Structures are given as structure tokens and as C-alpha cells.
């Protein structure tokens, strides 16, 4: 009698263990399926992001991003700022030594920061633009974000006041205006200002 009870009890324990094991297996399968589904969703999202990034990159390259180019006149300048959300433009004079220094740095940055368009224009050929933007110092750099001129770099005062500044110095100064992004500790954001025109006096070393 006692042996039968013990046997029945053992069988019940075995069945209970089997039920629990089956339930665990079912839950594990659910978790595995859920993880697979999640991974598939993540994979699809990542693929879409990569496709969009590639499409955006191709479009930007077709608009002149990735290289440092000259624009001939006001029309080309405004076309560049319409097609690209972020534009950095050097106003130069032929033969100006400091403009050639900026050229060297912009050649590097244009290849590195494809999301930003780097251009230069002969200040003598865009009188309307230099008047509108109050360009009085050469070299002057206009920073345009979403068709608004948000900042200027006039001369080399903000770059250390010397000719021998690094590309990183220029890069960090541009990052303060949020026209490009750099991976570093932190950059103090520059105070944003929209400058359409106006009369401002600049006491820089190269008045034009």
C-alpha cells in the first residue's frame, strides 16, 4: 500500500516536472521568437537608415559636397545655399596669402565633413553680396545654415591671430557655429545671431 502511494506520488511529481518543463520550453520558444523578431525589426530599421544615409550622401555629393569649389557669382552662391543646409563660404582676393592658408584647411575639411558644403568666391566679383554681408576684411568666412547667415570669421583673430593655426583649430571654430560636428570633449556653443545686413566696424589686420 505504502509502496503504491509512493509510486503514485513519484508519477505525479514526474508529470508535474514534465508540465513545468514544457511550460519553460514554451516560454523559451516565445522569448527566442521575440528576440528574433526584435532583431529582424532592428535589422530592417538599420537597413533603412543605411539606405537613407547613402541616398543623402549621393545627393549631397551631386550638390558639390565632399570637395572645395569656387562659385562664380551671387547666383551660384544663393543656389549653393538653397541646395545645402550647411554652407561655409570663404570670400577671398586673388594672390592673398592668408586666403591660400584657408584654402588648404578647407580642402581637408570638405573631404572630412561631407554634410557641409565648402565654397569660396572672389570678393571682387560679388559686390552686391559683400555689401549685403558687410564683408570688409579679407579673408572673411560666412557660415550659412538653412539659408541664414548665422556667423562670420573675419581675419585670423579667432583662430589664434597667427598664420600657423591647425586644421583642427579651424574645425573647432566652425563647430561652435554648428555648421559641422566634431567628436571631442565639448565645444562651447557660439551665441547664434542672424545677420542679414548692418553696419559693423571691424579692427582686423586686413581691411579690404
UniProtKB/Swiss-Prot annotation:
InterPro entries: Thioredoxin-like_sf (IPR036249), Thioredoxin_domain (IPR013766). This is Thioredoxin domain-containing protein 9. The gene is txdc-9. GO terms for biological process: microtubule cytoskeleton organization. Keywords: Cytoplasm, Nucleus. Gene3D superfamilies: Glutaredoxin. Transmembrane segments: none annotated. It is found in: Nucleus; Cytoplasm. Residues 68-179 form the Thioredoxin domain. SUPFAM superfamilies: Thioredoxin-like. Required for normal microtubule organization and function. Regulates tubulin acetylation in ALM and PLM neurons. The lineage of its organism: Eukaryota, Metazoa, Ecdysozoa, Nematoda, Chromadorea. Disruption phenotype: RNAi-mediated knockdown results in 60% embryonic lethality. Surviving 2-cell stage to 64-cell stage embryos display a disorganized arrangement and do not undergo cell divion. Due to short and diorganized microtubule arrangement, one cell stage embryos exhibit nuclear-centrosomal defects, failed cytokinesis, and abnormal pronuclear activity which include failed male pronucleus migration and the presence of multiple pronuclei. One of its GO terms (cellular component) is nucleus.
